[in-house]
Amino acid sequence: GEQLATSNIDRNVLRIYGDGFYQSVDYQLLTQRDRNILRILPVEKSWGPDYLRFALNLDTDSNQGSSFGLRAAYQKTLINELGGEILATVGIGSNLGAGLDFYQPLDPAQRFFVEAGIKYERVQQDIFQDNKRVAQYINSGTAFALSAGTNFGTLGQARLSWIEQSRNFDRDIGSSQLPNFETSYSGWNARLSLDQLNRLYFATQGWRTKLDYFDSNDAGFARAEIDVEGAFSLGKTVITGRANYTGSPKGQLPFYSAGRLGGFLNMSAFARSQILGDEITYAGVRAEQIIGTFPIGLRGDMRLGFALEGAHVGTYYTETNLSGTSILNSAAIYLGGETPFGPAYLGFGYSTSGASNFFLN
């Protein structure tokens, strides 16, 4: 017979263990009646399958000041024999949010699923003009979604959803740069997400892509987004490229659903979401040199990075003084990496348009 590929078995066993449902996963090879039988030996966690998780985010930059967020999530897994899950989340801090989600596979292999979810969010949106923060709006809303989809093994997922939404976009402080909105609408959403990056943040190899399309006859617009990223390593140097398009195949994107530029590795010279607009195209490439590891207790490599970015905005909603600029540019240098608590980085971005930004997360 064929030689046993132990490396493939080890990889699949690690993937099963990585699901988080098992205390241990092992395997053994048995010989019965001139046949070799591979037996997988999973042991379910005795303390599961319920999980309570917490996350803390702290960031600051020279244009927006500091913000923070504390998030808690309760996940109840394996609520039936097909692997149904319930996820409840709540977030407080500079932004507020809460959500409840039910995910139900339709077959033992979990190739097909249905999902229902409801969420509320209240986000502070700073409005910029001439690189100065001139107003702050509150972008809040509630959304209910019913979805059906399919999983492509470890490659990714495709889903089709019907979404009911209500949105409020109201000025909180500052000048009236944008009109207030209060609206309710519904529509279809199709999404394809494929991910083969070897890490969630600061990957060293692989690729990912996301295609997202939302169409609402009620609101009179459609929103399309394409996001592609790839990474590879040359020794201790990691090269990563990313491209994104956000636009409106039908109508014009409303302010509360606009494309966004600004923030770390999304035109780093600008503050987070400093530029709102429609028909936005972005491309960026960065090189990172692994220069060491984080101090004791913090796993992960430490990197010194340099990024070059460019973008074109068809219609500006903020920073309208840039409307005559064909291509926006940004360059950034930073120090950071991935830790058990998430990504951490410190850096500086600059654009020849006059924008600059120190950032820490």
Describe each PLM feature range.
Residues 71, 87-88, 101, 207-361:
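C-terminal transmembrane beta-barrel domains of outer membrane proteins
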